[in-house]
From Swiss-Prot:
Protein name per its UniProtKB record: Branched-chain amino acid permease BrnQ
Lineage, top ranks: Bacteria, Bacillati, Bacillota, Bacilli, Bacillales
Family under the similarity heading: Belongs to the branched chain amino acid transporter family.
Subcellular location: Cell membrane
Protein's job: Branched-chain amino acid transport system which is involved in the uptake of isoleucine and valine. Probably does not transport leucine. Together with BcaP and BraB, plays an important role in the activation of CodY, a branched-chain amino acid-responsive transcriptional regulator that controls the expression of several dozen transcription units in B.subtilis.
Gene Ontology CC annotation, any one: plasma membrane
PANTHER family linked to this entry: BRANCHED-CHAIN AMINO ACID PERMEASE BRNQ, BRANCHED-CHAIN AMINO ACID TRANSPORT SYSTEM 2 CARRIER PROTEIN
GO BP term (any one): isoleucine transport
NCBIfam families: livcs (TIGR00796)
Record keywords, A-Z: Amino-acid transport, Cell membrane, Membrane, Transmembrane, Transmembrane helix, Transport
Amino acid sequence: MSKKVSASYIIIIGLMLFALFFGAGNLIFPPMLGQLAGKNVWVANAGFLVTGVGLPLLAITAFVFSGKQNLQSLASRVHPVFGIVFTTILYLAIGPFFAIPRSGNVSFEIGVKPFLSNDASPVSLIIFTILFFALACLLSLNPSKIIDIVGKFLTPIKLTFIGLLVAVALIRPIGTIQAPSKGYTSQAFFKGFQEGYLTLDALVAFVFGIIIVNALKEQGASTKKQLIVVCAKAAAIAAVLLAVMYTALSYMGASSVEELGILENGAEVLAKVSSYYFGSYGSILLGLMITVACLTTSVGLITACSSFFHELFPNISYKKIAVVLSVFSTLVANIGLTQLIKVSMPVLLTMYPIAISLIFLTFLHSVFKGKTEVYQGSLLFAFIISLFDGLKAAGIKIEVVNRIFTQILPMYNIGLGWLIPAIAGGICGYILSIFRTKTS
């Protein structure tokens, strides 16, 4: 029998969602957005909140709504092979390709680089990442409550310090907001919309959804309706907190340009703003907190990805996979944070439209009676367009295709050219399913 989930526990779940999404790695994007957007910071931030806050929480709700046990079973609604391929690519993105290396980069940029001389050699990054990921690997191979205790203890301190930092920045801004940089002078909302992809949160949300469902079931929530309602309420709490923090961080970045100039990445912005307000002690405290927070994130991601790939390839041991992921992440991290962000954008521009389409089709599943053709048509059309978006972002421009897409696809120039084709593909798929039913 289903039990009522208390309001206090819903708040706890909401705070847990906030803590899960407001990771150390994601702190770097709003300040950089603010720096580049300048006087258009509020418009750009609104776009960022859509994909950096709204979409991830919508993804979690969609996962709960689907009633599935994991992402692979949900994605298999498109096709079993797609389920495996999409889930594998997603775990690679939130694992050794981007998210795990990024955690090491952010730790270095905030916890180590500010204390090095300007002419420090790249060897310092190599040494740091080897030590960082060796420790992360060791902890993932030997599961211990220590990492959970440190995480639980550190999270409130980290949030308090970041909250204090942005509060001071709001009360006593470093300087006045400057003119927007190139790329944010027009269509700043859609630029911010795409920048929200960099958080990877809409992809990670499918994994977090499993955690939320299990937590709610332990509290006695068993019916699908109850799970959805409770999840939606918890998501709303997390959304408000995330929106407030991201907006404050964006403003902090925007107001820092007059004094600090345009910096290389968001980690550098955080480090220099912290040093500006709190001196060297503030920089040391921020560096320690971010480094430990990123370490716990890395351990969690290595563990989750290793478990997934071990299930996919049971003949390869969990420990071997964890070691390979750690070594690979070390290599990737040494291209540097700024370059890693640049490399990740083309991939995310290709992946996100597919993920967004899957989210909305999940909510509409009963409307089109779960017909496979609808999923396949919508995601195929979205993928074709998003693939060219990704290629364009990577500097591979096929002028003929870009010219045709610009002429025939609404919103193609702002990165949303896939939207109408995704809808059209779903409609075509539905018509095809009716035709197949009649001819069978």
